[in-house]
Structure formats: structure tokens, C-alpha cells
Amino acid sequence: DLHSQRRRQRQMCIRDRHTPDALKNSIVESKKLETSNVHVLFGCGGNRDRKKRPLMGKIASKYADKATVTDDNPRYENPARIREEVIGNLKNISEIGNRKLAIKKAISELKRGDLLLIAGKGHEKFQSIMGKKFPFDDVKIAEKYLQKK
């Protein structure tokens, strides 16, 4: 796994997970740890297999204690539409398009014993939007907000 950190009994894992099976396995394995709740924050890339989006939403909804959908690499697609396809008619998934704000909020809501699984981008150092690559590092952003927690 790319990155794992524990601070004041709150845990965070950042993993490169882009398929329904990988997301499910990560959540299920995380729940085996000594954690109170597993929160998953994830997104689906644009211009990729659209059929897996609703599957990933259903998996997060079913296996995580809390799930938030955010933007990954929307590429040339409308990020709001990607999130909509992930969520569908599921009621227990929240949506925050801005990935940095989504990470900040997820960390701020962690309680003692909780684990936050940030899935999707993993080791990537950029976010691809409309043909441009913007600097973005899940690890650095998450560490920044975890330090403040």
C-alpha cells in the first residue's frame, strides 16, 4: 500500500484503487483492522469504463461505514456527471467535488479509532482536467490536514 499513517488513534490509508473489486477488497480488509468505522473517499476517472462507476458506488455504500464521492481525474468529462453516475439513487453517499475539500472534511470528521481510506489516485502527483495536469498529491494534502487534527 502506498501510504498509511496513524495519528492520535485516527488512521488514514491512501491506495491506488480503480476497480470495483480493488475498492471492495480495500474496504473489507480495512474493516478487519481494529477500527471503529471505515470511511472511504473515492472518485472515478473520466474517459474510462463508465460501467464500473455505479458498481463502485454500490460497493462503497454497502461495505463502508461512510462514503464520499469526489473528483479523481475527470479528464474531458464533466466531473459532476461522473459523480452522479457513481451515486445513482444511493442515499448514503455524500458528494464533494473538490478533492482537497473532500479530504479536509473527511479528516475533520474522523473520530478516535476511525480509519479513512482515500482510494483512487494513490501515488499520482497531478489531477487531469480538460487536457491539463494540475499538481495534486493526496498524501501531502491528507498529511497537512491530519497534522491539524
Question: Which residues are covered by each model-predicted region?
Answer:
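ATP-dependent carboxylate-amine ligase
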Residues: R8-Q11, D16-K149
